[in-house]
Swiss-Prot record:
Keyword set includes NAD: no
Catalysed reactions listed for this entry: isopentenyl diphosphate + 2 oxidized [2Fe-2S]-[ferredoxin] + H2O = (2E)-4-hydroxy-3-methylbut-2-enyl diphosphate + 2 reduced [2Fe-2S]-[ferredoxin] + 2 H(+); dimethylallyl diphosphate + 2 oxidized [2Fe-2S]-[ferredoxin] + H2O = (2E)-4-hydroxy-3-methylbut-2-enyl diphosphate + 2 reduced [2Fe-2S]-[ferredoxin] + 2 H(+)
Originating organism: Trichodesmium erythraeum (strain IMS101)
Gene Ontology MF terms in the entry: 4 iron, 4 sulfur cluster binding; 4-hydroxy-3-methylbut-2-enyl diphosphate reductase activity; metal ion binding
Active site: E187
Annotated residues for binding of [4Fe-4S] cluster: C66, C157, C288
Protein name: 4-hydroxy-3-methylbut-2-enyl diphosphate reductase
Family: Belongs to the IspH family.
UniProt: isopentenyl diphosphate binding residues: H96, H185, S317, S318, N319, S379
CDD domains linked: lytB_ispH
Reported function: Catalyzes the conversion of 1-hydroxy-2-methyl-2-(E)-butenyl 4-diphosphate (HMBPP) into a mixture of isopentenyl diphosphate (IPP) and dimethylallyl diphosphate (DMAPP). Acts in the terminal step of the DOXP/MEP pathway for isoprenoid precursor biosynthesis.
Cofactor: [4Fe-4S] cluster
Keywords: 4Fe-4S, Iron, Iron-sulfur, Isoprene biosynthesis, Metal-binding, Oxidoreductase
Domain of life of the organism encoding this protein: Bacteria
Amino acid sequence: MDTKAFTRALKKSENYNRQGFGHAQEVATLMQSAYKSNLIQQIRENNYTLQRGEVTIKLAKTFGFCWGVERSVAMAYETRQHFPNQQIWISYELIHNPSVNQDMKDMEIKFIPVIDGQKDFSVAGNNDVVILPAFGASVQEMQILKDKNCQIVDTTCPWVSKVWNSIEKHKKKKFTSIIHGKYSHAETIATSSFADKYLIVLNMTQAQYVCNYILNGGNRDEFLAKFKQAYSEGFDPDLDLEQVGIANQTTMLKTETEEIGKLFERTMMKKYRPDQLNAHYQNFNTICDATQERQDAIAGLFNEKLDLMVVIGGFNSSNTTHLQEMAIENGIPSYHIDGAQRILSRNKIEHKPLGREVKISEGWLPEGPVVVGLTSGASTPDQAVEDTINKIVAMKLVVMN
């Protein structure tokens, strides 16, 4: 499929909207009430610090809703305002936040069901409204919705669209796209759908394996087994790694994306000589500003003397997971929760350790004065951060009283 021609035609369709419906002021009031927090604003104005009894909270200087997420949520609210009586669907979670997705359900916005790992778009009627989430949607999904004559409301983050543009540039030069991301993540599924040839690498270890294969060859069957589900149909590592372009899932670790890009650059220079680099390697900066800012902000917190970190965000949120990863790498006890309800008591917290299932841990909140570093992922509203702060303070007060 000519994906560039398809998306160009789709955007000209009268059934396509990515600008909203003129209800911005009304929606802003609703979102202020639902997601903003006076307490959080006060903490920002107090050098991102709150002192309550034995608890000192140190907030990262950038956290929570990013511009792309806020835009996506606002467009969903606008869509319900504009189509008060029509059936509205979301093709996936709007964002990776359980409370916001519940708000969508409370507005009688339904989610396209997933059956045996596949989205069942047959439930959407020809005149239904379908919202594409902040992560975007695959070309194939958009084609289905266009063919069904659905009203498409596209809330894809512009940073994600920027990555798609890079993929189109790779494709124009017949390069294979090397995508730094998680092959099962909604954004990476959407991004890879724009490529003719692609390979998804999760981390530096996988990137090093690929680069070693480029330089020295290897066992083709082993390669394909190692990257099962992470490459395009018909991909051949012996033929399709001679010209590569770098792209990324926007929520991956900035430093790792940069290191992977440099590794492939060095590899192609070594394989084909420096003067031939441009014929074999492309890299465009597609690291999301919001992701970078939140990672830089938590790094700034590490200069403080912290007893522990609490990281708030959906358990399936990639950008939140990477914030958690940074805290752990800096040797700080860290707890990833998706809301204040996970703080069960002064002694118990339900959280998701890095790379593991949700569990309950004991002894998470130290005795005596405690300094808690706190941040949240790009899909987490300020109100969820306030609720968590209040719960932590309340747990300490129980002991003091």
